[in-house]
Amino acid sequence: MGFFDLFRRHKSFSHGGIYPAEHKELTASQKIRRLPFPPTLAVPLSQHKGAPAQPLVKPGQEVVRGEPIAAAGGFVSVPMHAPATGRVMAIDLWPTAEGPKAEAIIIDVHEAATQEVLYGMEVDVLALPPAEIVAAVQAAGLVGLGGAAFPSHVKMTPPEGRTIETVVVNGCDCEPYLTCEHRVMLEQTDQLLLGTRIAMKATGAKRAMIGVEDNKMDAVAAIRAKLPAGEKAITVHAVEAKYPQGAEKMLVESLLGRQIPEGGLPADLGVAVYNVGTLAQMGELLPQGRGLIERVITVSGPGVSKPGNYLVPLGTPISFILQQLGTAPEANEVILGGPMMGMATASLDVPVTKGVSGIVVYEAGNPDQEQRRVYPCIKCSRCVDACPMQLNPSMLGQLAQTREYGRMETDFHLNQCFECGCCAYVCPSNIPLTQYVRIAKAINRDTPKDDG
């Protein structure tokens, strides 16, 4: 960090946001370590936005680590690959973080297997034409690893009439406790930069802007140190450490000074946004012709004996991870993702999927996690001030309580909310505004629209 960086106010979005306790000191200095393979893997066929993957294997079939086991179910879909060598036990319903069970391929992992990845063929990715790169990205099963899990190749093919001029690389890692992206930027810098160049080639973008929160200046320095002297196409920018800086709309505004229009996409501004973890995997897997079979996650929180950043096979049950880290799972509350936007899980059989960036564990009875009494809204407007989308969470909450879900959408821009949790965090009445929004969206999705 330079001397003047100590005093410079870094870029940020224009409205709202909060400064929650970060708790990143628990794992920020912990290098990425590999966890053992579990005896059983459960690989859901829907780990991404879009159509579920379609099984290519049958019960009783032997599979090799890296082998395709499910094909993409359409353009907005990605394939699945075997995270370990083993035998397919079943294709059955399995618990998920979202609540309902979903179809998954259950693999009995061979203990004696070497677990080498035997699939793949080396290729000079940057020598390929853009269309072949897009196809390779889909074939690798790559999705947004920051949590959204949107298929990465779809962002490389913008709607007709749109062109991509800028690749925005999201290195904010803004959720409390989570540091997996921080460690990726420090330890997989070469892969990250190669993935960035691959994304630029595929989209036709002339420049890339890497945004990193200013509480991770070591990552800023690490990336800049790897750039060639005089590099102008790829630039690294420190942005203010303010939640939710890592949200797509917020980071685009912070870096470009432009807002994505309501109901619009980054492509409307000529932008494609990728997470640093996604691009690091792109730079790692595509040159080897391999698929995504594992990811880095942060395991942290007051209920974890050995917090850290771990490389785990996709499909690993949470229960196995917690056992490996010396945690008694029956005594804790477990959240998949970060405490702001993550989901508490009712079953520890839920597996790690492509969109899971962390596991936060709270001790039973932790006062921060105890059910708190909800009081009436006092019209303090703290939620309005905190909302980065400039919505009126107070009014959304009142309409939710009277079950006027349609008005929430038509009159108060319900679908503009991306459920960051800022409003609920600052509410002195403990009103669960984020949960109200999620319920309203779910009900509206299931309610037939009146064409009249």
What are these regions (language model features)?
Residues K206-I318, Q324-P329, G338:
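Hydrophobic alpha-helical positions that pack around
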Residues G86-V88:
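Conserved hydrophobic positions within beta-strands
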Residues S357-V374, R382-V384, P388-G452:
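Ferredoxin-type iron-sulfur electron-transfer modules in oxidoreductases and energy-metabolism complexes
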Residues A90, P95-F150, G161-R162, M217, ...:
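Acidic low-complexity segments
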Residues Q115-E116, G144, V167-E181, G303:
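Gly-rich Lys/Arg/Thr-decorated short loops/hinges at beta-loop-alpha junctions or inter-strand turns
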Residues K58-A71, A90:
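Short, well-structured beta-strand-loop connectors
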